[in-house]
């Protein structure tokens, strides 16, 4: 297995940025789209619950319909080559005795994992569906981070979008997907200009060593 050296890793991490405008003439190859989809699919999650569904939007008309309900992100989404709609599963789908969880794992992993997960629902969440929903969103955001970093490693760009009307976007997608519950959007494409210098808190404000 080959790894990037430290200098290259640092360069890629610094070059990754939230791209606010994409090259509207750039078109993803089928290989690029498949690779992005696989990056998403392989994302880690607590208990390997994978409580998500990724909708890869490449249809321009559909993408623009979504953009129309994305407030100040409209122009940026319209310029993107593709849009990932990150949908979260509903809390009821993660109940240990439900169809999804019962069919997610193979034995003997299933029995011990579902037992441990049920204990977590009791001890950490006190069987609160609201807390379970927050847990599901946490897992989705882990996947979002992996997608954005993975796309950067491909030499491409992304922008995480939280500013959109979830109900309206859901209505657009509901014509093709049954009752989607949307966590966030990720615009994908190729930048039209170089990013400004990355701005982050100094190390001593961001990190504590013990």
Curated annotation (Swiss-Prot):
The keyword Translocase does not apply. NADP(+) binds at residues 150-155. Signal peptide: none annotated. It comes from the Bacteria. Its EC number is 1.-.-.-. Keywords: NADP, Oxidoreductase. Gene3D superfamilies: NADH Oxidase. One of its GO terms (molecular function) is oxidoreductase activity. Belongs to the nitroreductase family. Reduction of a variety of nitroaromatic compounds using NADPH as source of reducing equivalents; two electrons are transferred. This is Oxygen-insensitive NADPH nitroreductase. It comes from Helicobacter acinonychis (strain Sheeba).
